[in-house]
């Protein structure tokens, strides 16, 4: 049975280029076998820091859908976009939460990615907001132009609560929690 709105990314667990390609082909075959829209997750670089763009280019040329992960820089986006095939769908996972942890606004990275997608006419590239830290990242990802966001179930629950509580009520509940915690502490 088809799952038209569902895709799944499965990561290779190797650093050797030949083994990464072998695993990627195997993972890709599971999509047909199990009728899933499978993307093969490839890290942006090897353990020693060398880019995986030759692997990305080879797999994309074979029509294997990729999710290139652990992306943090403009240069990485440029290299990935140039390596991707215009006929093969791909996801570029930008670790927005971790960028913010070091004081960098991820909006600039996403804006650059959108510009690169337009410049190269590679419309099948989607950008993923990874490493969400708080529920409001859902809004951040939308305003940054992310096509996809990953969130934990706990964060999704909080997003589902958006606009369902007035700030004054939330303030009251927080103050009540302070007293309850103090009472429990003795």
Where are these regions (language model features)?
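Active-site beta->alpha loop and helix N-cap motifs at the rims of alpha/beta catalytic domains
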Residues: 1-62, 96-99
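Catalytic alpha/beta core domains of metabolic enzymes, predominantly
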Residues: 50, 67-157, 163-182
């Amino acid at each position: 049975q088809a799952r038209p709105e569902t895709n799944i990314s499965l990561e290779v667990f190797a650093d050797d280029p030949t083994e990464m390609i072998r695993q990627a082909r195997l993972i890709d075959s599971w999509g047909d076998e199990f009728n899933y829209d499978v993307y093969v997750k490839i890290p942006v670089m090897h353990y020693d820091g060398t880019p995986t763009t030759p692997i990305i280019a080879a797999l994309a040329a074979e029509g294997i859908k990729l999710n290139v992960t652990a992306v943090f820089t403009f240069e990485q986006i440029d290299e990935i976009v140039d390596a991707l095939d215009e006929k093969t769908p791909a996801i570029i996972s930008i670790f927005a939460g971790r960028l913010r942890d070091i004081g960098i606004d991820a909006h600039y990275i996403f804006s650059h990615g959108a510009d690169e997608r337009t410049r190269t006419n590679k419309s099948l590239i989607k950008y993923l907001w990874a490493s969400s830290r708080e529920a409001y990242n859902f809004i951040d990802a939308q305003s940054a132009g992310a096509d996809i966001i990953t969130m934990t179930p706990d964060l999704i629950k909080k997003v589902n609560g958006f606009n369902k509580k007035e700030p004054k009520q939330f303030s009251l509940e927080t103050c009540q929690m302070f007293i309850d915690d103090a009472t429990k502490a003795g």
